Structures are given as C-alpha cells and as structure tokens.
UniProtKB/Swiss-Prot annotation:
GO terms for cellular component: blood microparticle; haptoglobin-hemoglobin complex; hemoglobin complex. This is Hemoglobin subunit beta. The lineage of its organism: Eukaryota, Metazoa, Chordata, Craniata, Vertebrata. Belongs to the globin family. Involved in oxygen transport from the lung to the various peripheral tissues. It comes from Spermophilus citellus (European ground squirrel). GO terms for biological process: hydrogen peroxide catabolic process. Heterotetramer of two alpha chains and two beta chains. Residues 2-146 form the Globin domain. The modification N6-acetyllysine is found at residues 59, 82, 144. Red blood cells. The modification Phosphoserine is found at residue 44. The modification S-nitrosocysteine is found at residue 93.
Length: 146
C-alpha cells in the first residue's frame, strides 16, 4: 500500500487512540450480524442466534482480538502486506475456504467501528488512509487464492 507521510501520520494518530481489542471484537461481531452467512465459519462459537448473542459472545470477542492483533501487526509492515499476511492467506484459502470477499467486508467493519469509537477524531483524512489500508490487507489475505 502506498501511503503519503500525511496518511501514515493520520493512521498512527488514529490507531493510537483506539482500544484495539474492543475494535476487533465489535468489528467481527458486526460482520457476523450484518452479513449472517459469515457465521458458517464460526460453528464452534456457540450461540450466534441474535445480535445481542453475537456481540456478547466471548469466543467472538477473543477471535476479534486475534484478528485486530494481526491487523495491527500489518500496520507495522505496510510496505509488505502480502508477506505479512502470507500464512494467514494460505490458512484462510486452503484450510478454511473463506470467500475472500469477506476480507473486504471485515475491513469496512473495522473502519466503521473506528469511526464510531473515535467520533470527530476520525477525520476524513484518517478514514481515507484506513480505507487504503483495509483494501491492501484484504488484497494481501486474498493473495493465495487461485
């Protein structure tokens, strides 16, 4: 992902203000509620029968933290997203058979949740930069697909 110095600064500033585990849990939870067909990958997570069940589910929260920790690591390697996410791409492609379109949906959920959490601190410039990043991460995660 090619980012200007201003975009990198906007990302660093915004990311420094969020509680990553909360963003990850809420973003994954929202993905499962808004796009219920994505729940099929999480059969072992227990009750996902309603929005409140999903958003309160401890396994959703824990996996959301794993997801956002990987995303956060990607923010440290913006010049090599494909390399950074290569093993996760392979896992999601070869073993889990996740539709790569879901990565784009989750990226958008991350941006939405960040906007919700940061309010006015999530400037249009920060949003534009994060949209580039989540698109780059989705592309990197889809890289191993044939």
């Amino acid at each position: 992902v090619h980012l200007s110095d201003g975009e990198k600064n906007a990302i660093s500033t915004a990311w420094g203000k969020v509680h990553a585990a909360e963003v990850g849990a809420e973003a994954l939870g929202r993905l499962l509620v808004v796009y219920p067909w994505t729940q099929r990958f999480f059969d072992s997570f227990g009750d996902l029968s309603s929005a409140s069940a999903v958003m309160g589910n401890a396994k959703v929260k824990a996996h959301g933290k794993k997801v956002i920790d990987s995303f956060s690591n990607g923010l440290k390697h913006l010049d090599n997203l494909k390399g950074t996410f290569a093993s996760l791409s392979e896992l999601h492609c070869d073993k889990l058979h996740v539709d790569p379109e879901n990565f784009k949906l989750l990226g958008n959920m991350i941006v939405i949740v960040m906007a919700h959490h940061l309010g006015k601190d999530f400037t249009p410039e920060a949003q534009a930069a994060f949209q580039k990043v989540v698109a780059g991460v989705a592309n990197a995660l889809a890289h191993k697909y044939h």
